[in-house]
Amino acid sequence: MEKLKLGYLKEFCNRTMTCPKEIARIIEENEHKIRSCYSESFDISREDFVKMVLKDSTFIIELFLRADKKEKYKNDYLLSNPLLNRHILEDLILLENQLPFFILEELHEKFSKRHSENSLFIDLSRNYFYSCIKSIPKVMEKEKGKKKEVKHFTDLIRYFHCPTKHKDFGDSIRDLSTATQLYETGVIFKLDEVGGLLDIQFNKWYPTEICPCFTCSWLLNCLPCLKCFQCLERTQPLLKIPQFEIDDITEGLFRNIMAWEQCYYPSEAYLCNYMGLLDYLLDTGEDVELLVEKDIIVNSLGSNEAISKMVNRLCLEIVEENSCYSELAQKLNKHFDQCCNRNMGLLKSTYFSNLWRGIATIFGLIIFGFSLWSIIRPYVV
């Protein structure tokens, strides 16, 4: 790895037509500021510290510049090696490995800015992480060209996942039914293709609050083609969730971001709140399977059970002061606690789960009606 870093340092100097001493001078000027960004002191000399930051910072910037033009550098040793590229990504998101973001920005601004289509280092970083981390919402593409003050890459990736609009925080979630339990009470899980990862919404038509029989879920279950009529779909209790692709780096990524949030954003722990909500919804493999069927979860990890265990592990040592999903949880609990919703859900799943069962149920009711009429008719006429 050391040899690779030295090679990238040489390439960076060739690209920017500068020398390592000139880059080192900028780092020396900021040495005290860089050291102050770490909670622990470095017991190394000034010269060794500057060399370390020089190699790491130029390696990262050169990597991002090459990744931004993959076609040109498709034969690059690192970019053409998926396994090595994955290890580099894991190192970059590791909380204890972070370089202060400001020094990377300053070096890019002074030396490599003119050699990149992205004038801001944050945009260069966004392009790299967006291509590697599937959970970063596409909505973040709209944020290009905006400068944002971040401390390091873990903080930056958290920012990429955060909602574009501030969410209201309420009490922490104490109790919530699982995805399959909610589904049994008539809640329809739907993929939200527009919102960011954390933009989860529960919409329920007001008349169904008063009388659950006003829902058209049974009809839409039998005739899915009618879902194109918005007026019918609105009658269903809809839980809209954006897609979440889970792979083998997801656990490490979220563990680092959640640890960072617990220390520095305890009152705005968006990712901790999100994972806490999933911890309630995804209690078993069956819950995961339901969301996989709805295309809400893309399982690149393996078994559905592995995902539920991963989510449960991530939330083991998390302490929630509040939650941005407090109101959502209250609405879902209110829906679940109404016995009428459970009865309607049972009716739908038992008698109207598909077209043929729905037709059989209707014919059965018609025959039952005629039979009943034939019995009582002599006494009525």
Describe the function of each predicted region.
Residues 1-359, 380-381:
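Non-transmembrane
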Residues 362-372:
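Hydrophobic alpha-helical cores of multi-pass transmembrane domains in eukaryotic membrane proteins
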Residues 372-381:
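Membrane-lumen (extracellular) interface motif
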